[in-house]
Amino acid sequence: MPGPAARSRARVYAEVNSLRSREYWDYEAHVPSWGNQDDYQLVRKLGRGKYSEVFEAINITNNERVVVKILKPVKKKKIKREVKILENLRGGTNIIKLIDTVKDPVSKTPALVFEYINNTDFKQLYQILTDFDIRFYMYELLKALDYCHSKGIMHRDVKPHNVMIDHQQKKLRLIDWGLAEFYHPAQEYNVRVASRYFKGPELLVDYQMYDYSLDMWSLGCMLASMIFRKEPFFHGQDNYDQLVRIAKVLGTDELYGYLKKYHIDLDPHFNDILGQHSRKRWENFIHSENRHLVSPEALDLLDKLLRYDHQQRLTAKEAMEHPYFYPVVKEQSQPCADNAVLSSGLTAAR
């Protein structure tokens, strides 16, 4: 009979929620105030997800362009969680701003109203990003993650679709907090979160005592896909195959070391599909099309993010201090620098 898995706790911000009043994290007791959706005129559909439909809209009281996320029938508890988290994070660095919570007067369907971001589809955008652009946007995303983690919240669905980028304005926002959750040490969480290609090994081996470091794996997957121009970087056909794809890069011996450390029992199905794989060098993924985006610092950062052992991954704050970001920090610390001009490289061209 397999024994219980070993306990684990976040290396940072572990006690944030226990130091706050219950009202901060007890989302089930939260009572959102719902305004009237009639103030918002839907303009066009932007997309749909598992839990919502998203529209561009106009606030007819002030002509402001907004995004309205109409929530599909889902447990009230989940809606309360998303609203409470968005309210707690309001005003945070690079976090999408919740403007209003409204209900359709007839159907009573709840909807969330957000600031509008003129996003470029990542499949097009990632093809044109320069080395500096990648460093810049990854740094901006880390600011958002360090902010939410410092507030005791794990995003749990970091992926390109949830990172809005207005490339003209060099503006990034982390969106879709529908899977986000409050971190409490030793709590066991649902592993059915995040999107397949961005799921950390802890989710794939059914280890429930995870923490903020889950988001750092997902960010590592994004970084890998950007610098190597391979989208997605780990391309599994299903959740089982996803771990196999990871093992083919990080190695099977290293995986077994991770499982042993945390007393994790692997699903027997893996016996048939995992095989034996050596750890690959990150340099193996460099080719003529991506060489200009890869540097020793990029590979070093990547190596410190894509670790099986969630406790070994860099935290968001540690990642921001990595040499890979020195050029960005240098630019952002320049007084009165026009970041948009600098980062587009126009100054160099003059």
Curated annotation (Swiss-Prot):
GO biological process: apoptotic process; DNA damage response; double-strand break repair; protein phosphorylation; regulation of chromosome separation; Wnt signaling pathway
GO cellular component: cytosol; nucleus; protein kinase CK2 complex
Modified residues (N6-acetyllysine): 97
Top-level EC class as recorded in UniProt: transferase
Chief subcellular location: nucleus
Residues annotated as transmembrane: none
GO molecular function, one term: protein serine kinase activity
Binding site for ATP: 46-54, 69
Domain of life: Eukaryota
Residue numbers of Phosphoserine PTMs: 18, 21, 288
InterPro entries, per database record: CK2_alpha (IPR045216), Kinase-like_dom_sf (IPR011009), Prot_kinase_dom (IPR000719), Protein_kinase_ATP_BS (IPR017441), Ser/Thr_kinase_AS (IPR008271)
PROSITE patterns, A to Z: PROTEIN_KINASE_ATP (PS00107), PROTEIN_KINASE_DOM (PS50011), PROTEIN_KINASE_ST (PS00108)
Activity regulation info: Constitutively active protein kinase whose activity is not directly affected by phosphorylation. Seems to be regulated by level of expression and localization.
Pfam families from the UniProt entry: Pkinase (PF00069)
Record field: catalytic activity: L-seryl-[protein] + ATP = O-phospho-L-seryl-[protein] + ADP + H(+); L-threonyl-[protein] + ATP = O-phospho-L-threonyl-[protein] + ADP + H(+)
Subcellular location: Nucleus; Cytoplasm
Residue numbers bearing the Phosphotyrosine modification: 13
EC number(s) from the headed UniProt entry: 2.7.11.1
The Protein kinase domain, residue ranges: 40-325
Residue numbers annotated as active site: 157 (proton acceptor)
Function according to Swiss-Prot or TrEMBL: Catalytic subunit of a constitutively active serine/threonine-protein kinase complex that phosphorylates a large number of substrates containing acidic residues C-terminal to the phosphorylated serine or threonine. Regulates numerous cellular processes, such as cell cycle progression, apoptosis and transcription, as well as viral infection. May act as a regulatory node which integrates and coordinates numerous signals leading to an appropriate cellular response.
Further comment: Can use both ATP and GTP as phosphoryl donors. Phosphorylation by casein kinase 2 has been estimated to represent up to one quarter of the eukaryotic phosphoproteome.
PANTHER family tied to this protein: CASEIN KINASE II SUBUNIT ALPHA
Known partners and oligomeric status: Heterotetramer composed of two catalytic subunits (alpha chain and/or alpha' chain) and two regulatory subunits (beta chains). The tetramer can exist as a combination of 2 alpha/2 beta, 2 alpha'/2 beta or 1 alpha/1 alpha'/2 beta subunits. Also part of a CK2-SPT16-SSRP1 complex composed of SSRP1, SUPT16H, CSNK2A1, CSNK2A2 and CSNK2B, which forms following UV irradiation. Interacts with RNPS1. Interacts with CSNK2A2IP (via C-terminus). Interacts with SIRT6; preventing CSNK2A2 localization to the nucleus. Interacts with HIRIP3.
Family: Belongs to the protein kinase superfamily. Ser/Thr protein kinase family. CK2 subfamily.
Name of the molecule in the record: Casein kinase II subunit alpha'
Organism listed in the record: Bos taurus
Lineage, broadest ranks: Eukaryota, Metazoa, Chordata, Craniata, Vertebrata
Name of the coding gene: CSNK2A2
